[in-house]
């Protein structure tokens, strides 16, 4: 929750409180028989480079015209979960009302007041009221988004954008909060805090490529490093129409996978090489028709062209300017708030641009890798490289781990495999495609010389003529004797 003071004086205060669904806090009981639970906190792994949040809201009567994020560190970090998958904490402030027992009265028991309301529709009327002889105080007064991060078994960077997914399932609820001191006839004062909400702002949270949202009944098995999801669906946006109890997993499209395959024919880099191979097979069967077939082959080769797929990336950027009314410049504080709003919008746009450029960079790298690889000509959806599969270097167990996206030393092995494939592709690129075939044709061309075919035929004809001549002579002698 976040609170913004609207009006304050000595005995009456008005606040605007904003609440939404977020990450579930890990809570514990301070005593076994106590009904109230408090969040589990820690002071380790504090976020560096951020100031501490203010300890209390700004005092004084004023009207707040804008709400600005101001990233800061709370006095303590809350623990979101401690599971086998890891320990997740958050140093962002978690606003809540707390009964102030600084007077050390033994009858006073500090406990948290949270807004655990149940929705009955978007515009449901909700009211919460607390009356106590002890004052209330607002804890964690900073206005900052949640920034969860994992600290065990490994460290991860903070994720200040994930809270938007949880907020989209419920919307942002606005509470009109009044806190006042009621004077009674007795010497004991009464503190009254009332929260009324009649307005919920529905929002929609979306992700951009290459990310998607996997929604459904998700079961994680950390020991097996496996995630099961039955009847799950992929979305790019979510809102309050989704079941708030469902699981949402942010997934990212992979650059590609490497698996060994077998071909039922020799690997060929272009259709022209395939045509030459088929024609040569036919020529070797009918050698005497080589001259006419070769003319047809040369005519066919003239019609075959090799095309290289190139990709152009254009980044379309639009700059929008906003005109502010002169009332925003009446005083320096409003001018400062306006400038801070502009800075926040620019920061959001820069963040979106950074993600877009990262995605475009990945696409360009994929295209570059695709253009560098020598692929089999008869496959367009995937690439079959000429690099032979070595089972000793890359066993099927490693291939299976790669398909399941398991880390460890497998990433290094896959990188080495890519380098070897690229080296093999560069070696193929250094020679003209099909040069070995044409070298074979050059060596076999003398065998297709028709004059060489006539030499053995000429000798056979002479021998046959001599044999016929001998037979005729013998026949003539026989006739004379008769």
UniProtKB/Swiss-Prot annotation:
Keywords tagged on the record: Cell membrane, Cleavage on pair of basic residues, Disulfide bond, ERV, Membrane, Transmembrane, Transmembrane helix, Transposable element, Viral envelope protein, Virion
Main localization (coarse): virion
Function: Retroviral envelope proteins mediate receptor recognition and membrane fusion during early infection. Endogenous envelope proteins may have kept, lost or modified their original function during evolution.
Official protein name in the record: Endogenous retrovirus group K member 13-1 Env polyprotein
Record's subunit section: The surface (SU) and transmembrane (TM) proteins form a heterodimer. SU and TM are attached by noncovalent interactions or by a labile interchain disulfide bond.
Native species: Homo sapiens
The family this protein is said to belong to: Belongs to the beta type-B retroviral envelope protein family. HERV class-II K(HML-4) env subfamily.
Transmembrane segments: 459-479
GO terms for cellular component: plasma membrane
Tissue specificity remark: Primary culture of CD34+, lung, thymus, ileal mucosa, small intestine, and testis.
Record site feature (Cleavage), residues: 289-290
Subcellular location: Virion
PANTHER family, alphabetized: ENDOGENOUS RETROVIRUS GROUP K MEMBER 113 ENV POLYPROTEIN-RELATED
Designated gene of the protein: ERVK13-1
UniProt GO molecular function: structural molecule activity
InterPro entries: GP41-like, HERV-K_env, Retroviral_env_glycoprotein
């Amino acid at each position: 929750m976040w609170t913004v003071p609207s009006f304050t004086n000595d005995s009456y205060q008005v606040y605007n409180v904003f609440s939404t669904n977020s990450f579930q806090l890990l809570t514990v009981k301070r005593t076994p028989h106590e009904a109230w639970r408090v969040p589990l906190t820690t002071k380790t792994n504090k976020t560096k480079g951020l100031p501490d949040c203010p300890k209390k809201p700004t005092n004084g009567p004023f009207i707040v015209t804008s709400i600005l994020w101001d990233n800061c560190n709370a006095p303590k970090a809350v623990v979101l979960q401690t599971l086998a998958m890891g320990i997740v904490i958050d140093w962002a402030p978690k606003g809540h009302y707390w009964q102030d027992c600084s007077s050390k009265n033994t009858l006073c028991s500090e406990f948290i007041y949270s807004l655990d309301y149940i929705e009955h529709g978007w515009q449901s009327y909700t009211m919460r009221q607390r009356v106590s002889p002890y004052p209330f105080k607002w804890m964690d007064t900073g206005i900052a988004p949640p920034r969860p991060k994992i600290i065990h078994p490994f460290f991860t960077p903070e994720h200040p954008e994930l809270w938007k997914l949880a907020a989209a399932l419920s919307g942002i609820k606005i509470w009109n909060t009044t806190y006042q001191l009621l004077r009674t006839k007795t010497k004991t004062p009464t503190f009254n805090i009332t929260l009324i909400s009649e307005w919920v702002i529905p929002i929609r949270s979306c992700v951009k490529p290459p990310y998607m949202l996997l929604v459904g009944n998700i079961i994680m098995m950390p020991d097996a490093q496996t995630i099961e999801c039955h009847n799950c669906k992929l979305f790019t946006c979510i809102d309050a129409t989704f079941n708030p109890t469902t699981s949402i997993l942010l997934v990212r499209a992979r650059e590609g996978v490497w698996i060994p395959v077998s071909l039922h024919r020799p690997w060929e880099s272009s259709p022209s090489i395939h045509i030459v191979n088929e024609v040569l097979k036919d020529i070797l069967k009918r050698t005497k028709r080589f001259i006419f077939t070769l003319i047809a082959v040369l005519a066919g080769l003239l019609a075959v062209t090799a095309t290289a797929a190139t990709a152009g990336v254009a980044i379309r950027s639009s700059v929008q300017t906003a005109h502010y009314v002169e009332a925003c410049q009446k005083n320096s504080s409003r001018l400062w708030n306006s400038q801070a709003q502009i800075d926040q919008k620019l920061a959001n746009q820069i963040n979106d641009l950074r993600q877009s450029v990262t995605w475009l960079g990945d696409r360009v790298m994929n295209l570059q890798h695709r253009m560098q690889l020598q692929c089999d000509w008869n496959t367009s959806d995937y690439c079959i490289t000429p690099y032979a599969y070595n089972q000793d270097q890359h066993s099927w167990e490693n291939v299976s781990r790669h398909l399941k996206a398991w880390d460890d030393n497998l990433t290094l092995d896959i990188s080495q495999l890519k380098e070897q494939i690229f080296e093999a592709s560069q070696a193929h690129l250094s020679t003209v495609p099909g040069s070995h075939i044409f070298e074979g044709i050059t060596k076999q061309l003398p065998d297709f010389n028709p004059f060489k075919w006539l030499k053995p035929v000429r000798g056979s004809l002479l021998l046959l003529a001599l044999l016929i001549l001998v037979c005729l002579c013998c026949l003539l002698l026989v006739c004379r004797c008769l």
